[in-house]
A protein has these predicted regions:
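Cys/His-rich Zn2+-binding cysteine-cluster or related metal-binding knuckle/ribbon modules and their
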Residues: 2-9, 17, 30-92, 198
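Short, well-ordered alpha-helical scaffold segments within catalytic/effector domains
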Residues: 12, 55, 67, 122-129
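Extended interfacial segments that mediate partner engagement and assembly in macromolecular machines
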Residues: 26, 75-144
Length: 204
């Protein structure tokens, strides 16, 4: 597609590189921004720059944060005894929206997937051992997607740490097999957390 301006073409190229946005949608968004006051486009640009430069990863759970320790980990209203193990920040947001969970989190940063070249060494599994060594955790809750990769990841972690004093559980399968956690509705996800099941080799 030819554009009347190289600047416009560059903007369309960059916007269309975002997930789920094709070139036609990117063009509509670029044209929309051009119709807005300059302050609107500048505000968006500054927000994106701040997103890249200023956002931090929580040292405790690997969540996104404005500070070295996120609000959840630093809250005295959240128990240290429950740690919910999830794949990424979208899962934390989904679970928080249920209002049913009062523990803390540990974000793995993905799941074991040999097809995509992701092994245990690419995940934040050492942080689980760190939590165990601190001696505060009573239960780890697996809240991973109901996929083969999610099940493989949970099983690997369980096998690695099963001989510890900590209990392992998994959210109840109100989530359909093959579904990612972030797409579950809040009511089903909340019930899955409240009705979680003990995790063991015979009941993954």
């Amino acid at each position: 597609m030819d554009y009347p301006s190289k600047v416009l073409a560059k903007a369309v190229d960059e916007i269309s590189g975002l997930p789920g946005i094709g070139r036609k949608t990117a063009l509509r968004l670029a044209l929309h921004l051009l119709k807005q006051p300059n302050s609107r486009a500048m505000s968006l640009g500054n927000s994106l720059i701040s997103l890249v430069n200023d956002i931090k990863y929580c040292k405790e759970c690997h969540n996104f944060s404005d500070f070295e320790i996120c609000e959840i980990c630093s809250s005295d209203k959240r128990t240290d005894e429950l740690i919910c193990i999830v794949e990424d920040v979208r899962d934390v947001i989904a679970i928080e929206n249920t209002g049913k969970y009062t523990g803390k989190y540990l974000i793995l940063g993905g799941k074991i997937s040999p097809m995509e070249g992701v092994g245990p060494n690419q995940l934040n599994i050492p942080s689980i051992e760190k939590k165990l060594n601190e001696g505060k955790v009573r239960e780890f809750i697996f809240a991973l997607s109901a996929t083969m990769e999610g099940d493989t990841t949970a099983y690997y972690i369980y096998k690695k740490f099963k001989n510890t004093e900590v209990n392992f559980s998994s959210i109840a399968r109100g989530i359909s097999v093959g579904d990612e956690l972030e797409y579950a509705d809040e009511i089903s996800l909340g019930r899955s957390i409240m009705n979680r099941l003990p995790y063991n080799e015979g009941n993954p």
